[in-house]
């Protein structure tokens, strides 16, 4: 951008538009040039005449006339004297508006420091002079001396330590030095003058070069830091052309009087702005000081007065920053200039970002069920007031009134003409409705008003969800758009019918709820054997007539024609079909319409019919719902609540089970933890059983027409969980600490709770209310931070032409799917071709925009990962390109240029914040430690491959897992087989991997894409997804037999230790087939093939009942065009059910296993972690001493005693079991507290014997930060307290010598790199000696820090981690948010880089610089032939990112206002006004939407 020239602003010439705003320090000359005169007296106005005093704070001579065009003494009045200066009172005759512009000044007798540059860290004056802030304050407040020149002075008699310039001395030192060296050039002074002189005398360039040398030479970390700090400040002065001496004030500007008004109240009192009081103190002290100096008063008195002057100026700028705040008459601190601009009540947030506007009103809302989608009811009274100017114009226009006065009179009388004109104005004129809190863009929508009587606004029921409004007393505000542009915008973009989709997820939000759902659900239910069953109806009119004549029940099953075939439906569903558009298929409406089903229909209509169709359809749906909900007359009765008959018995049985567990515990068979876990299990199980019995009862009651069941089942109100509390048992409750109380509430609400039960349940209820209050505030703050950090993200171009993308896959958390790949692909652009794994054809090329259909195609093709373009990898400057962002979810189209995607992202993440829990709710105790945590079961077909898996064979002949990590059991199917025996060679060329098989006579090569092959860290469970990727069972150079598979597709995998714990028993052998029931899944004909090489060879003549012995048998289903529709792998040992060439439909069984048992891959003890012997040998105990570190436990079953490590082991003991193997090697096993030991001292053990067992930790209801705190933790990039250490390289672990009680972990890579890590006491290592770890894998317990992840694994890994973590929180609460919103925020967190080497640039090492500035500076330096700077990506939390925004105005209005402005003034920063916030503040058009074309000429062509 070319250098812009500052605009000279004068009183009569104000700029219409500005390009930039610069902040600078004001020189004394500048202050004088602003000033219109010196304020000499502290007086304000004369109490008798109420006229301003001359030379006082409100002086008319300095600041301008009090009355428009009238001088103070009244000699000159009226416009004709404009510009005349009255010779009597000295006032210029002009508009009184100048009192808002004209400034005055105060000549200070002595220079005074500006408190911002002293006390706001880092203290600028202190840093420049190189003295501590405390010392600087002592000098300024006349408590200490600062050395101006040391001369030949020394502190000690031996002349060893010289007195240096800038040393700070106390009174005593000063006296001594003056008496000894006063003649020899020693000079020291105190106060503002000396500081100003010192600042004036600094040669910045000299100092800069000298410090640059120092920083190169110094070795110490701390010194480097302090020098870098100084360099930064010096550099900012050098670049800005500011003079450091200007930080000391010699002339104080005085604010224009109308900005610090003095208002007279009734009763002769005055309301006065605090700033006036602060100015008066400054003037008083300054005048007194002047007199004292003239009188040549004693030094001590003058000094005191100077100190008081400094203090009063400090108070004026920032009261209370230093020492005690100056208090006013009413004992509260006075509001200084800093306080006026900062904080929620400050200028920025109160008056600039949120203004109150004209033409607005607010009132209560009531429901308007008769309105159509775009309408709202507006009370006539309000309309009359809001449209008053329009009305006056209209009345004059029509000739009903001749003058404004007459028109006003008519409006007051409310004559008929007025109503007629009002109706004409309002017709087609949109109004905006807004409901606070405005959490997202749907909280402000436009409607066409309908004039109504009464005093309440009527709101359409369907828009309530978007506004989050209900009718229990909510209020809404109305705003009138005035300009034609605003009206157009309201009509085109903001009408309610345009806002059917939620920008956060693209799902419809204006969908029926509550009564409407109930009505629609009710009419789509079916009943057997009612009037008119099985009749045939031609159309809906016949149905209506029949119902009206009572010949047909609305729930009767009837038949009708649809698409030329007869379908079975019900009378009610035909009524529903009548209001649907024609293109809706019957499977969408011919079913029981629950809330979800209705939403699906609305989504379908929106996608295929567009906005116009949808709006009309929604209105018809609303009317139908309300009508039938009314007619159904569904009500609640206590008898609808059905309590299961077997409840008493079931509870009695559970009590007995608990009693048994208690007895076992008392006998010492169970630990306290096991007892607790088991009891909780019993009750959870009881509660679930009762709940299912009760739900069955309610469902079957009245043949499905039980009112309570209908309400919950339809999704209108209530849930199964609530019915369970009404009719089952209330269940387990949690203590304040989050532990679950083991005595449950047995009663339900119908029976009533007893006193104890009631008391237990009150805690949860009260906590719920407290949480809600806290939550709202937290969620609001999170939204504000998000908006602030993302406000400048907009779409700047269509395509940035990057080829980079990020690999994505399903997000799941320990087998529960959180977000599917299909969902994640919808509305995104591919960054790489997607290849069909079956046919190897390109399904979708790079650059394709995927919609729901294509995303589904990809998912159904069995593809598990894909590369997509994301905002994070976008190369656009100052924004994002449309293709990296994808679809705008609110419209379903590719996003348009100028869309403010940052704000939309922030709102989408912030708005559901209130729904997130503050702490995770505690659903079950250990209800989950059931079968799933004892074993893993194969759910797909294929065969088993061990990856790195080693096993021990125990004495019972079991296979026990010997790996602690970096191993897995894979379930695969063959992809390529070796066509002949030979040697396998694998080589990587660019992004392709070539696998070849060579025999003596022949070589064959297969080419695969590199990113389709599972990487070692992915196989070990450290990286991304392995499902759907390829695995090479043979290493390069291995020999293979003919028809052995050399490339396999991974269908599932269980890695050690996260899916299969150490020391589990593996129940499947390497290479064993896993059979499943295989269904056709498509219509067509079955054909069987065998895999040969990488192609399929026809295998004919298979009959039903055949047991498969072939390897690599595939069944394909081909469609009528002989195209392969689907391919299934048939594992050995399956029984063929569908013979070759059989015709099948999707549900046909093709093959099945021999027996129906599922294949268990591995199983383990769910209640404890075993320690097993790794070799045979002899056991020896260390530090296991009965009574000190261990206790004896008697086992009733075996009759033996067993040692158990005590709960609290004294610090000096480390209980260890040492195993001496037969060849003399020693293996040490440290045992934790509560471990039971299964061997005796000196016993002999065999491989894989259990030595000891540690019980798994007590299952507290999850205490991991969940909900809101977790989200803000992720976005703030906080370093968690308990950070896990992560390995930076791939390598083998060993343990070195401990250092100061810290364990030393060494990771050594193949190429000889060693990395050392020290584990402190609070963490425990999770790796063992000899383990192989991958980069990014954790070495100790704790949470992985995002910063570490970024440093070691890079941006893409961090991206996947953050997106999945945030999604986990939101999805678990049932909130759908598209990934792209999280990505936009994440991109903003990465917009800065950290300088590692500064090269020849102006950066300083360790600086955080925005990527844009970094690139610009480097480009400039390279052009000049210098060395560019080197930087690394750096993750900044959203608060820091917002405060360090490139725009000063935006940063200042967010937080730390004084700090930001201080920094900006010193470095003379320029705000380019590129983003939303600063433009809102100064009142320009914002540069998004049509605002991006603001400066462009538009050409119209005629043809």
Swiss-Prot record:
Binds 1 Mg(2+) ion per subunit. Binds 2 Zn(2+) ions per subunit. GO terms for cellular component: DNA-directed RNA polymerase complex. Zn(2+) 1 binds at residues 71, 73, 86, 89. Its EC number is 2.7.7.6. Signal peptide: none annotated. GO terms for biological process: DNA-templated transcription. It catalyses: RNA(n) + a ribonucleoside 5'-triphosphate = RNA(n+1) + diphosphate. InterPro entries: DNA-dir_RpoC_beta_prime, DNA-dir_RpoC_beta_prime_bact, RNA_pol_asu, RNA_pol_N, RNA_pol_Rpb1_1, RNA_pol_Rpb1_3, RNA_pol_Rpb1_3_sf, RNA_pol_Rpb1_4. SMART domains: RPOLA_N. The RNAP catalytic core consists of 2 alpha, 1 beta, 1 beta' and 1 omega subunit. When a sigma factor is associated with the core the holoenzyme is formed, which can initiate transcription. PANTHER family: DNA-DIRECTED RNA POLYMERASE, DNA-DIRECTED RNA POLYMERASE SUBUNIT BETA. Belongs to the RNA polymerase beta' chain family. This is DNA-directed RNA polymerase subunit beta'.
